[in-house]
Amino acid sequence: MNTSHYSVLGHTVPYPKVYDPSLLFPISRAVGRTQIGIGVVLPFVGEDRWHAYELSWLDARGKPCVATATFHVPCDSPYLIESKSLKLYLNSFSAEVFNRAEALRLRIAADLSACAGAAVAVEFGLPPVGSGDKEISLDRLNVDIEDYGPPNPDYLSNVAQNLVEEMVEETLTSTLFKSNCPVTGQPDWASVTVRYFGMPIDHEGLLRYFISFRHHAEFHEQCVERIFQDVLQRCAPQCLAVEARYTRRGGLDINPLRTTSEMAWPLSVFRDPRQ
């Protein structure tokens, strides 16, 4: 079984000079999911949306071409794609000749699909930078914080029933999220958004919960699935979507999305301003 311990992550490796799809390194999703009580039947749908900013190849006359791209890895794929291996793989196209950009797109889609074990959609270009119209920022809350890890779901609760009578639909967001790479210890910064329909979730508790990831070491995708599970179990919304938009590293950023319903997908069609 592939694990991060055997990947290039955390190691100094030479940058490839020729195209090499074997650089891509899959990591089993099942390992991280078992730790948070997720079995074969997933409680969510969604994707890991990657934005690639450093993609270059040669045209038929040897002239360099550059582009950006978006990759959509389905969350029900058996494997996630390790980030440094993806960076090195994309760099390996820098001296590869393609007569048409479409041929490159198809090659990348085939290679990423083989690595993930499921069909990965690839398109050139990136979403625009922006934010949702009705997002409520939790960063404005005036709270004292003392707990920075491990993640503490005890902070999650609904507003007391004697204070509310009706279900609500809210989109709650925070730019204060930080977790850490489990291999290198490098900080991973993100904006996290929770959209739900149900009894009101306590805003201060949700912010405290987010900040309790600050010393936690876990892959991006697993952090989002942990948040989804904890909010679903502690607050019992009828519908739930969780998305994290991580800042760029190595010419890539990742945006995992997990939702109870494809009706809420995608949660956002924007990139975060910090991306």
Curated annotation (Swiss-Prot):
GO cellular component annotations of the record: cytoplasm
Pathway of action: tRNA modification; tRNA-queuosine biosynthesis
Gene Ontology MF: a single term: preQ1 synthase activity
GO biological process: one example: queuosine biosynthetic process
Active site residues per record: 181, 188
Keywords from the named record: Cytoplasm, NADP, Oxidoreductase, Queuosine biosynthesis
Binding site residues for substrate: 81-83, 220-221
Coarse class of the protein's main subcellular location: cytoplasm
InterPro entries found in the cross-reference section: GTP-CH-I_C/QueF, NADPH_dep_7-cyano-7-deazaG_red, QueF, QueF_N, QueF_type2
Enzyme nomenclature, EC number: 1.7.1.13
Subcellular localization(s) per the UniProt record: Cytoplasm
Function as written in the Swiss-Prot or TrEMBL entry: Catalyzes the NADPH-dependent reduction of 7-cyano-7-deazaguanine (preQ0) to 7-aminomethyl-7-deazaguanine (preQ1).
Family: Belongs to the GTP cyclohydrolase I family. QueF type 2 subfamily.
Quaternary assembly: Homodimer.
Name of the protein described by the UniProt record: NADPH-dependent 7-cyano-7-deazaguanine reductase
